[in-house]
Design a protein with these regions (language model features):
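Glycine-rich ThDP/TPP pyrophosphate-binding loop and its adjacent helix/strand module
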Residues: 2-127
Length: 127
């Protein structure tokens, strides 16, 4: 568990970096057992998983998310995937959603790396 400073989403690249460091510490020779060509970590093949929790407004509005996603496909930066839980808590209430982003969902930024996205209704967990 990593502490998040007052600057929203600043911990996102730190979490990815910590996962990457853990991968490297498990296999100092270059973690060849779960890397593909060019040193890119193959998704689903490594023993480390970064789990990150985000608020809706900060996930779509903070550029650090897009920067972290862009780095995830580079050799030397990939961690083989991470799980991002985006809570639609509407804490960023000072900006209405219709003018706070250019797409219907805050998770649409994940399309830049073709990551799968699952939308669920948190108000009715039994569904």
């Amino acid at each position: 568990l990593l502490p998040n400073p007052s600057h929203l989403e600043a911990v996102s690249p730190v979490a990815a970096g910590k996962a990457r460091a853990r991968l490297q510490s498990l296999d100092p020779s270059g973690y060849l057992s779960w890397s593909g060509s060019g040193g890119q970590v193959v998704p689903g093949s490594c023993p480390v998983l970064a789990v990150q929790v985000h608020g809706d407004a900060s996930f779509a509005a903070q550029g650090v998310i897009m920067e972290t996603l862009a780095l995830s496909k580079l050799p030397g930066f990939g961690v083989g995937g991470s799980v991002h839980l985006v809570v639609n808590n509407q804490i960023g209430f000072t900006t209405p959603a219709r003018i706070g982003r250019s797409s219907p969902y805050v998770s649409d930024v994940m399309k830049m790396i073709s990551a799968p996205v699952i939308h669920v209704n948190g108000d009715d967990p039994e569904v």
